[in-house]
Structures are given as structure tokens and as C-alpha cells.
Amino acid sequence: MKASIISKLESLKERHEELEALLGEPSVINDQDKFRAYSKEYAQLEDVVKCFARWNWLNNNIEETQLLLDDPDMKEMAELEIEESKAEIENAEQQLQILLLPKDPNDEYNAYLEIRAGTGGDEAGIFAGDLFRMYSRYAESKRWRVEVLNANESEQGGYKEIIVKVNGEGVYGQLKFESGGHRVQRVPKTESQGRIHTSACTVAVMPELPENEMPEINPSDLRIDTYRSSGAGGQHVNTTDSAVRITHIPTGIVVECQDERSQHKNKAKALSVLASRIAQAEQERQAQAQADTRRNLLGSGDRSDKIRTYNYPQGRVTDHRINLTVYRLDEVMNGKIDELIQPIITEYQADQLAMLSEQN
């Protein structure tokens, strides 16, 4: 391993020890903001420090074991142990490289998840409902909380559009690769001839930014409309104009929120979603420039990018970005999507490592 990397790891180890001492000081314990910040930083360093300690132990073990090579009775055992330790060192170094990759500061945030029915009429709306259930069950398995902000139900079931906020630890980091076009191939319940139809939905995932990171929005750039909240079939479920629609005039971005009875609360939530969308649009613009020069698993920002196909007759799900196919469609639609999410994260980390190698 390079001396520069070892030096960085030593610095992180020292910081970890420093934080451990700070967390035991009464002045820090009594300051909740400081205690939370230090605890979070300490937890973030835990894995890399443990892995580095293991790497150090393995290297020391090889040095000590090499002393046994001169002993005829111990030579064979010593050679085997050295070989095993070298293999473990290689694994530890690969793990350390991944742990040292630059972290996306947004990964720890809550996320806004938007699902919109695309081509396919009623069937696309039904599939949007299926995707919402899939993500809700996945969130439940992670002990995250799902809060519906706006839902426009379709007549045959499902949704024309649904926007939710997912609250929990590391939500955006886990869900950010879900953005893009999701396609379904199946025989709709309304199809009498038994023909397979193809429908599509788009999914967008955005981090919920803290107030100090939100882009500045000029109030004069906003058009705010209020209307009565409506339920399935369009019937009004509220006698006051509590639902809010905000249009950001310069970008044309429109956000609606009607889940609260209070217009003030709906407006605050809609403004938060709007800020995240504006920030995301800027990130997507930068991602497009990146995608022009190299592969970008986060997508170019074009929500029509087809990222995944759910084929019901064959019981398979295919992720087109990494050519991954799994034949457990029922499990996937019941929220078991880690086997789709983790390979994408691993591939993204490999791309980052390749980029760092090129720079070095």
C-alpha cells in the first residue's frame, strides 16, 4: 500500500482516538449538538479504523511468522500462514480503498421519491402503484418511515403520480440509483386476448437538503396557487383550499402538496421539495457533462433513461446499466431489492476507484 495512503489512515486513526476521548468529556456530553456531531464522525470512522487495525495486525503477523521459516518443524505451517495472511492483506487493502473513497455528503440525508406513470395508460398507473408498494416494503425492512406528500390516483388503481418523503439513516445513499425509467412487461388484468403489454414509469430520487444547503429561491420567481385537496376519482375531501401548487417560473418546475390539512404546512413541504428539485436539476446538468466523457451510473439526468425491466411472464428483473438479471420477480416486488441495489453501488465504487487510478 502507498505511503501516502498509510499516512492518511494513521491520521484517521488518531482522529478516531481523539473523538473517543472527546466523547467522554463532561463539556461535550452536556452539549447535545456537539455530542451528536462527534458521535456521527466517530461512527463514520469506525469501519476504516477497524480495517486498518486488521491490516496492521496481518503485516506484523507475517513478520513474526517469517522468523519460524528457519525451523524445519515449523516451516511448512509458517509458509501456509504467511500465504493466508498475504491473501487477507490484499482483501483488506481493497476494502480500505473503498472506505477511503470520497463520500457523497447527501448520502446520509432523507430522500424525496417521485413515481410518475409514463406510457401505457391505466397499466402504467397500476405499475406506479406496484413500484410504490415495492419501495414502501423495502423502507419498512430498513425501518425507514414513508410519508406521502402528494398522490394523484388513477381510475383503475395505482397512481398517475405519487411523491413521498422517506425518512431514515442513509436513505438517499441507498435509493439514489433508482432514478430513471422503469419498464414493465406483462398481461394487464384488463387485457382479454392475453397479450403482453409494455408500460413504463419514471422514478426520481432527490436528497432532502438541510436549510443551510438549500438553493436561494427568489419569492418573486414563484407562483403559488391553492386548491381543495382531492381523493380518488377527483372528489374533494377538504372544504378549505389547503392544497398548494408552487411553480418556479425560471425553470418551470411545479410541485404540489396536499397531505396536510394546513395550507401553511403544505406550502412549507412543497417549498422543501422545490428546493431539492432545483438543486437536483443543477446536479443533473453537471452529471450530463460528466456522462459525455465517461460512463455515469447515476444517469445523465434524462428520466427517460431505461434502467430496469420487470418481465412478469419470465419472472425476471433486468438492470440494463450493469446487465444484471435476477429471476426472483415476486420477491423484488415485495421489497427485497437489496440484490439489485448493492451490485449497482459496488459497480459505482469500482468506477470511482478507476477514476482515482487514472488521476494518480
Curated annotation (Swiss-Prot):
Region (Disordered): 284-312
Post-translational modification: Methylated by PrmC. Methylation increases the termination efficiency of RF1.
Molecular functions per Gene Ontology: translation release factor activity, codon specific
Taxonomic placement: Bacteria, Pseudomonadati, Pseudomonadota, Gammaproteobacteria, Pasteurellales
Gene3D superfamilies, per database record: 3.30.160.20, 3.30.70.1660, 6.10.140.1950
This protein's GO CC annotations: cytoplasm
Entry's localization field: Cytoplasm
UniProt keyword terms in alphabetical order: Cytoplasm, Methylation, Protein biosynthesis
Entry superkingdom: Bacteria
Source organism of this protein record: Histophilus somni (strain 129Pt)
Coiled-coil spans in chain: none
Name by which UniProt lists this protein: Peptide chain release factor 1
Family recorded in the similarity comment: Belongs to the prokaryotic/mitochondrial release factor family.
Pfam families registered for this protein in UniProt: PCRF, RF-1
Function text: Peptide chain release factor 1 directs the termination of translation in response to the peptide chain termination codons UAG and UAA.
Residues recorded with modification N5-methylglutamine: Q235
InterPro entries documented for this protein: PCRF, Pep_chain_release_fac_I, Pep_chain_release_fac_I_sf, Prokaryotic/Mito_RF, RF-1
